[in-house]
């Protein structure tokens, strides 16, 4: 039975109504079916604000200083239902923001703070996110007051930033612009485990080798934000924990210095809570009964608040003054020798062997009582690991450097998934350009577009070359963290120019023709590449009998090598591109699943994905010039032949090798075409076949061209945030 099964004597055994639970869904019957739902998320049907809602316009109405004043007041406005430690919510709001932003991973750009996803499952119920629900509920009166002018995503991150300011930190800045989602994300893979905090072994090739952590994951266990605070698989070993920290934080986009700064700065304020018994807590928010109203982990047997709060199970503060921004963390760590012990809840943690009474942090409710401070295994890693130790000692001896490093790392942590500065809004955006923001110089729009287009048309480059190059330049865009895309023309720079998926020799040949055109006309190369692709599409449409102009908006810029962190772009390299019928090697994941993942990252719907596949095949853009899926005798013409052939029952589909099929005439057995799984899924999957049949219809050849142009333009402009503004 499904998770909504309710058994009670005297109740009618007949089910009424719709399929409201997960257990009896279509995918439960056919778990291996292609899940197109990831392409149909976050549409207007789930958004209560409506299609016309414009967050950037609402933000213009926000009184930012009044909002920050209200947040500062909240920091010390302790509520009886969830009292503040030491009368301050600084630690609470810093942790809530940290844990929302800290789920980001660079591998696919998913996770992070950009969508307010902590409000929904699974993140709202992760073991590592215990009591972040209380943080969000404490913010509700402010969200209620400012309404649509501030998103939950922006509010949570701003609250964390204001918390640090209230503690005394000079922060680096803040940008608004995060838009809320309205249901759980269906596309993010958090791991294969079926239980919270399952041992790390299933996600590592070798748990003793941190680099063997499975992609795209960054956290070491299901339900954790980063590493296990008690040690690898809960077994204390600070050096082993350091190895996992280094890999995990690197996958979050952080270097060693940023890792030390974030760990120490995160633990300069607040405390761990483990003065209780986990068995006394109610279920997590998703599993709790309706009487809990979306709150989880409530103590149903004891007091459960203040000094009796349960969160991680570890217990204690890291510093003498946990509501102040100071250098107390490093001083506490290096001033004392530490021994392994256990919290009242039984969690492994470290405490000083000896410590002066005045160095102990006060009780959260009674300042006359003092308690032992504590360190996690991750904290001890900063002392034990040679690289982390050197950085930590430098920070301990230079508080200003530590404060600046943390402020910058905090800004990076909370803004990493927002994309370039063009998406930043509000009065506190820092003026400095940072390389991790993938800066792009302003482009020109005052050149003669028609003249540039004429130069490209006379260049001798084929429509296939033009379309493939523009596609390769634009397809790197990821809607998850808004990185990549055609703007910046980074396809000409390392590492993109050497990616196998970009066909380096063909790319170099095409760029050698387009670069002089850009230089001589005043257009950016980024614009010329896209304009060339548009021209190729127009030529292909004309060859099919349709005159159509592909929309073009000039103004892209060309980034330099100095503005490009080459190593950070490695994660954008495509391992496969079903749109060009290519994959680098065989993978456990099927080719059609990899196509779906790329389409989702690019922000495409299933119909858009379908029309792009059909058009790119017949134009002839396959990687390496392969003929797989080119179901036409009019290659180079933007016809609907791909769909016509795919749905023609005169054909038979025969597997002839790994991911390879032949399309044979049913009567003669003659081979007409070859195909891959990516091609055939548009006839085998019932939903995709329904789309294919629409485009195969005799009366929809023109619709196909128009829809292809619309989807193409969407891809080319995906990173043009200046247009959206």
Curated annotation (Swiss-Prot):
One cellular component (GO) term of this entry: cytosol
Covalent cross-link Tryptophyl-tyrosyl-methioninium (Tyr-Met) (with W-98) as placed by the record, residue numbers: 226-252
InterPro entries xrefs: Catalase_peroxidase, Haem_peroxidase, Haem_peroxidase_sf
BP term (GO), one: cellular response to hydrogen peroxide
Catalytic activity of the protein: H2O2 + AH2 = A + 2 H2O; 2 H2O2 = O2 + 2 H2O
Annotated site (Transition state stabilizer): 95
Family note: Belongs to the peroxidase family. Peroxidase/catalase subfamily.
Function in brief: Bifunctional enzyme with both catalase and broad-spectrum peroxidase activity.
Subunit structure, interactors included: Homodimer or homotetramer.
Listed name of the protein: Catalase-peroxidase
Species, as recorded: Paracoccus denitrificans (strain Pd 1222)
Gene assigned in the entry: katG
